[in-house]
Amino acid sequence: MAPSNLPPVFNATSQDIEMLLAAQCHLGSKNLQVHMEPYLWKTRPDGINVINIGKTWEKIVLAARIIAAIDNPADICVISARPYGQRAVLKFAAHTGAVAIAGRFTPGNFTNYITRSFKEPRLIIVTDPRTDSQAIKEASYVNIPVIALCDTDSPTEFVDVAIPTNNKGRHAIGLIWWMLAREVLRLRGTLANRETEWDVVVDLYFYRDPEAEENKEVEETKVPGAEEVGAGAIESGFVGDSWQAQATPGFSAGVAAPGTAVPGWEAEVSTDWAASSAPAAETLADPAADPSVKW
């Protein structure tokens, strides 16, 4: 990490650096855009470009100071067409008062005043200059400053402040937005001082797959063993993760023990058999006894 050019009060703590490394914010792509070269620390043998985390923190603080300088938070527009950043921009907007555009950016939002979604922000912040290129392009038409999370291969045209970071991982995106929101609240005075911990955990900014959440709820509501042995087997003795040692009274009462005769079985069979076999014998004997029958 390079020596910081910030005032001592803005220096990153060891915990901040550890979080940036744990979220893999320092891992860029294999391609390098020429304007992102100053933020490069080194290139690994496998071709991955490693970003200087010290530069990342400096740009987070710079971006937060720009955001805090705008009097009306509603004049700030945060944008993310990338799914991994949509939850993060919505949470950032909720905590700082900005306006969020999560999902597809409708062309003409900044330039076509006839549309209902027309906006005139004083600043926009985008998650990825490549996927949010339409928003950056329209901002350049109407002279709106742009702050962007830029990877090593991100285009930097019309980007005024580039925060060098990994903008493809969900943890990296969520952490950068969380740190940006925390720094803005510190500068606004919402958080008393820099030693005060923010009660919002970073996990709130991470992307969550809706289908995975639904599957998890379904798994939690399942009765143990229902899939493996069927619903009827649960009633007959499957409890928890093992079968009951003794059978239930209702189950044993209805089944006779092997090797034991049921009372009345032989008598019932012999009576019915004799009664049903007698007509059959007469029927077979009649044709032979009658000499008039010709085969």
From Swiss-Prot:
GO molecular function: structural constituent of ribosome
Gene3D superfamilies, A to Z: Glucose-6-phosphate isomerase like protein, domain 1 (3.40.50.10490)
Transmembrane segments: none
Region (Disordered): 273-295
Subcellular location: Cytoplasm
UniProt key word Cytoplasm: yes
GO term, biological process aspect, one: translation
Biased composition (Low complexity): 274-295
InterPro entries with a match to the protein in the record: Ribosomal_uS2, Ribosomal_uS2_C, Ribosomal_uS2_CS, Ribosomal_uS2_euk, Ribosomal_uS2_euk/arc, Ribosomal_uS2_flav_dom_sf
Any one annotated GO CC term: cytosolic small ribosomal subunit
Entry keywords, A to Z: Cytoplasm, Ribonucleoprotein, Ribosomal protein
Domain of life: Eukaryota
Subunit structure, as described in the record: Component of the small ribosomal subunit. Mature ribosomes consist of a small (40S) and a large (60S) subunit. The 40S subunit contains about 33 different proteins and 1 molecule of RNA (18S). The 60S subunit contains about 49 different proteins and 3 molecules of RNA (25S, 5.8S and 5S). Interacts with RPS21.
Function: Required for the assembly and/or stability of the 40S ribosomal subunit. Required for the processing of the 20S rRNA-precursor to mature 18S rRNA in a late step of the maturation of 40S ribosomal subunits.
PANTHER family in the cross-refs: 40S RIBOSOMAL PROTEIN SA (PTHR11489)
Family label: Belongs to the universal ribosomal protein uS2 family.
Protein name: Small ribosomal subunit protein uS2
Gene: RPS0
